[in-house]
Amino acid sequence: MTDTNLSSIPAYQKLKTLRSLLLRLHKALLDAERDSYERIHGRIATKGEFFQLVIGDPWFEWLRPISQFIVQMDEVLQAKEPVSPNQIHTLLARARDLLPLSETDPSEAAVRYQRARENYPAIASMSAEVTNLLDLAPTGENLNP
């Protein structure tokens, strides 16, 4: 299946939109965590040092599943081989479990994600966009078939 054929599939378009939203949300979450990290540990001097912290420091560990998921989406969206609709639907299903949206979830990832949503309006807005795109309405209603 070529990209031209895939681009007519609503799920493919949803995945492309999700990738863009998650990339922006991920950057905003990284920036928020950098601010928090620097308040405690001091200024991060270089982009290289920040990159090393992001990939190796426990402080940023909760964000790594989002990073890895973005890479997986890129692999599917940029695949030279045909991509099945099942692959796309599987990624969309995994995305629904990716973000710790529950305010009652006691995990560190959920607590930090909720804190970021509360402290940064842009993160709250992007989170809402992802939630709406993935049909994760708080009421449990599926807005799109």
Predicted regions: what they are:
Residues 1-145:
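Surface-exposed peri-terminal alpha-helical interaction modules
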